[in-house]
Amino acid sequence: MSDWIGVALFIVVGIVFGAGGMLTSFLIHPRSKNKFKLETYECGLPTEGATWVRFKTQYFTYALMFVIFDVEVIYLYPWAVSFVDLGLAGLIKMFLFIFILVLGLWYAWKEGALEWK
């Protein structure tokens, strides 16, 4: 039971810090609402045209692909550090992991997810 005291303390401190930050933000936020506070701020100049702009979904697709392959690097680093200890089995597993990721990239490329339209 004493092993879980540290975990419980960590969770409680996390909740207190999160709730404390939200409470502090609520207590000190500016309360005056007027026309100028609700306008979109653009370099100190009045906005011209529509302030709500639609973004292409390709931005989301590229961001998602970046996150996927960025996470791949996170898994490659510990493998590279302990490469000698893992031996041939670790090498085969990592090649399988990279093959699955390359297969996913090939599929996305084949489906046209990486083409800018």
UniProtKB/Swiss-Prot annotation:
Keyword Transport, does the record have it?
A: yes
Cited Gene3D superfamilies: NADH:ubiquinone/plastoquinone oxidoreductase, chain 3
Q: Where are the transmembrane segments?
A: 4-24, 64-84, 86-106
What EC number(s) does this enzyme carry? 7.1.1.-
EC class, as a word, reads translocase
The cellular location(s) given in this protein's UniProt record come to:
Cell membrane
- What are the UniProt keywords, alphabetically? Cell membrane, Membrane, NAD, Quinone, Translocase, Transmembrane, Transmembrane helix, Transport
Q: GO terms for molecular function, please?
A: NADH dehydrogenase (ubiquinone) activity; NADH:ubiquinone reductase (non-electrogenic) activity; quinone binding
For membrane topology, the record states: Multi-pass membrane protein
Q: Name one GO cellular component term.
A: plasma membrane
Q: Which Pfam families does the annotation name? A: Oxidored_q4
Annotated catalysed reactions? a quinone + NADH + 5 H(+)(in) = a quinol + NAD(+) + 4 H(+)(out)
What HAMAP family does the annotation carry?
NDH1_NuoA
Assembly information from the UniProt record: NDH-1 is composed of 14 different subunits. Subunits NuoA, H, J, K, L, M, N constitute the membrane sector of the complex.
Question: What function does the entry list?
Answer: NDH-1 shuttles electrons from NADH, via FMN and iron-sulfur (Fe-S) centers, to quinones in the respiratory chain. The immediate electron acceptor for the enzyme in this species is believed to be a menaquinone. Couples the redox reaction to proton translocation (for every two electrons transferred, four hydrogen ions are translocated across the cytoplasmic membrane), and thus conserves the redox energy in a proton gradient.
Similarity-based family: Belongs to the complex I subunit 3 family.
Q: What is this protein called?
A: NADH-quinone oxidoreductase subunit A
Q: What gene is this protein a product of?
A: nuoA
